[in-house]
Structure formats: C-alpha cells, structure tokens
Amino acid sequence: MKDSHQTIGVFVRPTHYQNPLFEELERAKEWVLKLLEDEGFESFMIDSLDGAQDERLIEKAYAFLCLGGDGTILGALRMTHSYNKPCFGVRIGNLGFLSAVELNGLKDFLQDLKQDRIKLEEHLALEGRIGKISFYAINEIVIAKKKALGVLDIKAYAGHTPFNTYKGDGLIIATPLGSTAYNLSAHGPIVHALSQSYILTPLCDFSLTQRPLVLGAEFCLNFCAHEDALVVIDGQATYDLKANQPLYIQKSPTTTKLLQKNSRDYFKVLKEKLLWGESPSKKR
C-alpha cells in the first residue's frame, strides 16, 4: 500500500438521535472505523458537513469514506472539492447512484484500494458566483421562486448572448452526474455521467414550447431573475439572489472525484436503479 493511501477521512450522515437510522449508523460507524484500523488505514471522523474542519487533516487524507446515502456523498464532495480529493460512498439509505459499495462489500473494496485495483472517476462540477460569494455544486444549481405565488422570469445568457427567458417555477442547471437526480424528476434528460455538458431544465414553465437544453461545458452562463429568488445547491444549501442580480455559472476547474470498483458499469447502474427493461409487475 502506498503511504499516500494510508489516511481515510470518514463522513457520517448527520442524524438526530430520534431518527430510526441513528442506532444503525452508530453501529456502522464503529464497525467501519475498526475495519479501517484492521486493514492498516489511519482514519479520522468528520463531524459535520459545514466546512468547520481542521484543514491539515483534510489535506492529509488520501480519500474520504462517506457513510450514508447520496446526500451524504454530495455534502462531502462539496466540502472537499477545493482540496482535489476523491470520495467513495458506503451506502446506508434509500438512494445509491453515487455509492461505491454496500456495507458488506467494504472490506473487499479496501483491499482493492490497497492494491490500486480501484478506478478514479472524474466528473464535471459547477462553479457558481453571486456577487462576492462563490460555491461549487456537484449535482445541480436551482434558481427557484422565493414566493409561493406567481411566475419567476429568468433571463439566460451564454457569455454576453441572451438565448432564453424562462417563465415558471424556476430552472435547474444540472451536471451530467446530477442528471439522474432532481433533473430527472423534472423530466430532464439523462446524460452520461462522464460527459462534459450542462443540462438546463425548466420547472413548470408557463410556455408549452420550453424544453430542456443540453449545452457544452465550454460556455460560461449567467442568469438574472426579475424578482428576488433562491439559489439552491444540491438541495442542501441556499443563497439569496436579488432581483436583476447576475448568477454566473461555469465549469469548475477542479473535477468531482469518485472512487469506484473496476467492475462498475454506468449503464448497468441505470438499468438496476431505474428498472429498465423490467415488467410493470416487477417495478411495483
């Protein structure tokens, strides 16, 4: 095992003690920490996803183990994005598009990691800016209404060129990795996770002619809403967007890095998670 592989940071899904998953996560956390020790890894816990961590520990880690569902992985990926470190998910929860393994497969995964038999996937991430505030998004950036009533007008530009005005509940700007998340629920297209593109999917648009749009990641985009709006990052963080204030979005210079098993195949994951080709009775 390479020396640089010896330290693993461990994220655990934040869970209230009254949550039904609390005891399961606590048991799993202790088991994972013991397994890492037995396999020769140093490890440290990361207590929250708010970024209030010791930078020296973050920089020391080779990778980050995320114990939970896709939400835990998304939070960890955003927090570690600027450090250019990979994450891998150990699924406990309902969703698992991003997870590398189930809990019972972690030992084999760690042994493969020690032998460099794990592949590194690099995905496009978004970098957004509102005024002096900048942020990263792994799955999507959503411009959403702040008020329950009415229609939100959003003007969209590629560079300095206006190309659309969306009128509805909002707009999703998704990454290919995030195309199977909120974007898919809003009837946006699935785009291969390793593609270099943005997916723009309107939310309940007032015009029946509006359709999702896929753009190459070489474009720098900006958006303005006609009234105060919310900008939602991966469904986990929000920022205020003032009326006519530009939101700038571009491809992040740093990729989202995920460790996966060599045997993982994206199309098999889609078929398994979305039940493609299954009969209606099996889907139920």
UniProtKB/Swiss-Prot annotation:
Its cofactor is a divalent metal cation. GO terms for biological process: NAD metabolic process; NADP biosynthetic process. Belongs to the NAD kinase family. The lineage of its organism: Bacteria, Pseudomonadati, Campylobacterota, Epsilonproteobacteria, Campylobacterales. Keywords: ATP-binding, Cytoplasm, Kinase, NAD, NADP, Nucleotide-binding, Transferase. InterPro entries: ATP-NAD_kinase_N, ATP-NAD_kinase_PpnK-typ_C, NAD/diacylglycerol_kinase_sf, NADK. Transmembrane segments: none annotated. One of its GO terms (molecular function) is NAD binding. It catalyses: NAD(+) + ATP = ADP + NADP(+) + H(+). Involved in the regulation of the intracellular balance of NAD and NADP, and is a key enzyme in the biosynthesis of NADP. Catalyzes specifically the phosphorylation on 2'-hydroxyl of the adenosine moiety of NAD to yield NADP. It comes from Helicobacter pylori (strain G27). The active site is at 70 (proton acceptor). It is an enzyme of class 2 (transferase). Its EC number is 2.7.1.23. This is NAD kinase. NAD(+) binds at residues 70-71, 139-140, 167, 169, 177, 180-185, 236. It is found in: Cytoplasm. One of its GO terms (cellular component) is cytoplasm.
